[in-house]
Amino acid sequence: MNEELRRKNEGITQDSSSLLIPHSSLTIENLVAGYPGRVLVRNLFLYLPAAGFVAVVGHNGSGKTTLFRVLTGQLPYEGRVQLLGQEIRTLRRTAAAGLLGYLPQRGTIDFAIAVRELVVMGRYRHHGLLSAYNPADYALADAALARVGMAHLAARDFTQLSGGEQQLVWLAQLSLQDAQVYLLDEPTQQLDVYYRRQVFGLLHDWATNHGKTVLCSTHDLDNLPELTGHLLNLSEPEPQLRPLSAATVLQARHWLERAPAPARS
């Protein structure tokens, strides 16, 4: 069964499997993770290619955030989890190494800061603790803001922006980390229709045009059929990658309209 799940997730044949596995950006085998008395992810197998977009869906409590906490090294786990061929539990600073970029669920900043100054902080791994950002860093920040359509707000106070504008600024900062794998935990939460489409469009562009692996947890199913990539529904008993399409999104919607399964101990 484990081998069958692996092949379903990769969409490969017997002859091609040995060629594709070494190029996986993320390999998960028999993952078990959760919290005392409550297992949220059990026996998960997942093999992601070196580039692509993956929408991670599921009920609240199905393990979406738990999976991301494992991948960012914040939560112990059982099983095998390899990021670009390296076991996660042996990596101390995936972000500093340029392997992984992570945008958690929307937070707040309670102090005034110019948008440009916030975005340039995405270059932190290229500098020492006390070194200053240079003109080249700011040029990259300006380019990142232009790509997300926020260049005209570079001098504005970030705290005065709308929720959608703030999220695009966070994406600009995240892009400056230039990681191979990006995790985004519900990046369209509480955004209106326009900004949800903007965010998904940017993430899809990272995967299809810039060779990044993008995992995006979301409850927003409406925009997914328009994207190219895969869908992972953690509410299924045996989650597996499925191509994104109107049919697979509808299937996921039917799953999510059911009552969630009881938490496992």
Put a short name on every predicted segment.
Residues 157-161, 165:
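Conserved ABC ATPase signature
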Residues 182-186:
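Catalytic Walker B motif of ABC-type/P-loop ATPase nucleotide-binding domains
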Residues 57-59:
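The feature captures the beta-strand-to-loop junction immediately N-terminal to the Walker
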Residues 72:
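Helix-to-loop junction immediately C-terminal to a conserved catalytic motif
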Residues 218-219:
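H-loop/switch region of ABC-family ATPase nucleotide-binding domains
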Residues 79-87, 96:
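Conserved ABC transporter NBD signature motif
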Residues 120, 135-153:
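Conserved ABC ATPase "signature" region
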